[in-house]
Amino acid sequence: MKLPITIEYNSGEQATYIAQPPEWAKWEKQTGHTISQAKEKLGMWDLMFLAYNAHKREKAGTPVKPFEAWMETISDVIVGDANPKATEKEA
């Protein structure tokens, strides 16, 4: 399951992170919930946790702020694809 999560930082900058199976596995381990419960159980902390871990994975070993400090830089969280790809109409 892939879930795009767009983070808007206090600076106004936005970044979209894709929560993929590694992030979901960490979420399951951290929360004790299973992926089948995600729809009912996902809250703001969960979304930031998933985005943070996707961000960390994308940085591939480059140091990132600790989770708690990183959360303090966020002004908004947007779930899903805000700009879905346009599809061509059939002729």
Regions found by a protein language model. Give the residues of each.
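Charged interaction scaffolds used for protein-protein
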Residues: 1-15, 25-45, 49-91
